[in-house]
Design a protein with these regions (language model features):
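Conserved helicase motor core of SF1/SF2 NTP-dependent helicases
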Residues: 1-134, 138-206
Length: 206
């Protein structure tokens, strides 16, 4: 699960008991780019116990992560729809809008519908992901991968400095193969604040 296991030594002790067992750590990340992985690692490094297990990307460079500030959630929805259209024109087929909670996903979906469009919403009841453009809550995103990911709301009111939010942000940031956009309005989450460019320009690469 997205919560994860805190101490694998307990698993080895109580599950495998006296049987011979060995713990191996898979550190290499083959999904995402150096630029994306380096930013995600800065988030997960806030959990001291996970620092030794931070992902090491294969040497595949790509675009820098884009941090985009908007005045409201409605403005975020509008900009994301434009980015989706542009990404598809550029040939990207699998695109995900990741919201923190299911309620936020539904709010996003409702605003999209008011604009005369629909996007598939992943609820966890699906047997498989068939591709295309989807909206997915952060806690269901683990194990999935997409060409492009847009984190819809990385505001401080959504992501605080606690272990659960750190893990959810990390999972969300490590889903894309090629391109990552992170949106927020109001105050940016402290998890990313040290990465924000002082220029404050829309679409700041960081």
């Amino acid at each position: 699960s997205y919560r994860g296991i805190k101490d694998w030594s307990d698993v080895m002790q109580y599950v495998f008991d006296d049987r011979k067992s060995q713990m191996l750590t898979l550190e290499q990340s083959y999904r995402t780019t150096v630029e994306i992985m380096s930013k995600a690692n800065r988030v997960i490094s806030r959990i001291d116990a996970l620092r030794p297990f931070m992902g090491k990307p294969v040497i595949r460079h790509g675009e820098k992560v884009r941090l985009i500030e908007k005045k409201s959630f409605k403005d975020i929805v509008s900009d994301i729809l434009e980015k989706i259209d542009k990404s598809r024109e550029e040939g990207y087929q699998s695109i995900a809008v990741i919201c923190k909670t299911m309620d936020e996903c539904k709010a996003f979906s409702d605003l999209v519908r008011k604009r005369g469009r629909t996007l598939d919403l992943i609820t966890g009841k699906e047997k498989e992901y068939k591709g295309g453009v989807v909206i997915v809550p952060s806690y269901l995103a683990k194990g999935l991968e997409f060409d492009v990911v847009m984190i819809a709301n990385a505001s401080s009111m959504r992501y605080e400095v606690n272990e659960l939010d750190i893990k959810l942000m990390y999972v969300s940031m490590t889903r894309p193969l090629h391109r990552l956009y992170i949106y927020y309005y109001g105050e940016l989450t402290p998890l990313l604040r040290d990465s924000k460019d002082s220029s404050g320009q829309e679409g700041t690469a960081f």
